[in-house]
Amino acid sequence: DLARNLGLVDIDDEYDEDSDKEKPIFNV
């Protein structure tokens, strides 16, 4: 996960690289 690697956003560990494409990355 690019965003997770950069530490820009907090996402669940369940979200894999493929999952990020399908599910929203930003949790507001």
UniProtKB/Swiss-Prot annotation:
GO terms for cellular component: host cell cytoplasm. GO terms for biological process: chromosome condensation. Induction: Expressed in the early phase of the viral replicative cycle. It is found in: Host cytoplasm. GO terms for molecular function: DNA binding. The keyword DNA-binding applies. Plays an essential role in viral DNA replication. Binds to ssDNA with high affinity and localizes to cytoplasmic factories where nascent viral genomes accumulate. May disrupt loops, hairpins and other secondary structures present on ssDNA to reduce and eliminate pausing of viral DNA polymerase at specific sites during elongation. Belongs to the orthopoxvirus OPG079 family. This protein is synthesized in the early as well as at the intermediate time of infection. Homoomultimer (Potential). Interacts with the small subunit of ribonucleotide reductase. Interacts with host FAM111A; this interaction protomtes OPG079 degradation through autophagy. This is Truncated protein OPG079.
